[in-house]
């Protein structure tokens, strides 16, 4: 019970630190989580507890018509212990490892939601709330790359489900580590319909009714980590996301691809 109580306390602290100031910075945290988890997997079997604090800045182009960029600046909290791991808005309970495979239970916060008025095309739309997700993940630390599989189900609001398959490979040259990464994310029709659908009561002359359908997004990027000292590092992540037809067919959306940039500083204790 103490482990689960600690997990709850860490989760609350991580979400509060990451989301309190800038609710639209979830896209920034997305790759901060990936960056921190990559380091965490390397010492998954270690009993040493580590902490980290930092600051992240990110810019992500929104798929919504006339929305512009999502920009956020927010604090980063990292924690890695024997049973628990927190990276930004993601908290894991470690189930254990078998050979090169690691398994976790996962809780995650995402602010995919919007309010009427966030963009002209969203005027008159009902509010779409942010999401709290529960699920699990598995990682395969292969000799040539690291592969991850994540399944999440929304704890309310959208009733959505997502499945994400990711791959990355790091190359270290002196103090610089380059990590090309790619991912494919499937979203069920409930998720797409909640965030990109248009109900009959929301129809306008410039916005037709739309029922979302399941779709798949693909992303590719390059993350650069630079070690200032043994405890301090900076990272830069450049990526591009291609949205599936279930999203691009929505009258709320006017683009099929969106670039993103993340920059941050982390100090590990």
Region roles according to the model:
Residues 1-48:
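Cleavable N-terminal export/targeting peptides
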Residues 26-33, 37, 94, 155-164, ...:
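Outer-membrane beta-barrel transmembrane domain signature
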Residues 51-53, 71-75, 79-82, 132-136, ...:
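Hydrophobic, lipid-facing positions within transmembrane beta-strands of outer-membrane proteins
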Residues 53-55, 77, 88, 103-107, ...:
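Membrane-embedded beta-strand positions of outer-membrane beta-barrel proteins
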Residues 57-63, 81-83, 107-113, 142-144, ...:
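Transmembrane beta-strands of outer-membrane beta-barrel pores
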Residues 57-59, 118-121, 148-150, 202-208, ...:
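Extracytoplasmic loops and strand-loop junctions of Gram-negative outer membrane beta-barrel proteins
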Residues 62-69, 87, 95-97, 128-130, ...:
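Solvent-exposed loop/turn segments connecting transmembrane beta-strands
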Residues 83-86, 101, 144-147, 175-178, ...:
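Repeated loop/turn-to-beta-strand initiation elements of outer-membrane beta-barrel proteins
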């Amino acid at each position: 019970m103490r482990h689960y109580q600690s997990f709850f306390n860490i989760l609350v602290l991580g979400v509060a630190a990451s989301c309190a100031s800038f609710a639209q910075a979830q896209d920034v945290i997305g790759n901060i989580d990936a960056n921190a988890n990559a380091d965490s997997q390397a010492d998954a079997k270690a009993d040493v507890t580590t902490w980290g604090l930092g600051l992240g800045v990110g810019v992500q182009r929104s798929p919504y018509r006339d929305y512009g960029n999502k920009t956020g600046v927010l604090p980063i909290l990292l924690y890695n212990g024997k049973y628990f791991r927190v990276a930004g808005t993601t908290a894991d309970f470690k189930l254990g490892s078998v050979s090169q495979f690691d398994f976790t239970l996962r809780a995650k916060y995402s602010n995919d939601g919007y309010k009427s008025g966030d963009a002209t095309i969203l005027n008159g739309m009902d509010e779409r709330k942010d999401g709290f997700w529960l699920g699990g993940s598995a990682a395969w630390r292969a000799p040539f790359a690291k592969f991850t599989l994540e399944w999440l189900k929304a704890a309310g609001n959208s009733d959505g489900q997502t499945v994400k398959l990711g791959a990355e490979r790091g190359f270290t040259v002196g103090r610089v580590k380059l990590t090309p990464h790619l991912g494919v994310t499937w979203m069920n029709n409930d998720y797409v319909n909640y965030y990109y659908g248009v109900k009959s009561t929301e129809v306008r002359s410039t916005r037709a009714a739309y029922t979302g359908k399941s779709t798949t997004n693909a992303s590719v990027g390059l993350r650069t980590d630079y070690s200032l000292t043994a405890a301090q590092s900076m990272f830069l992540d450049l990526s591009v996301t291609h949205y599936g037809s279930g999203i691009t067919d929505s009258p709320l959306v006017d683009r099929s691809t969106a670039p993103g940039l993340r920059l941050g500083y982390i100090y590990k204790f």
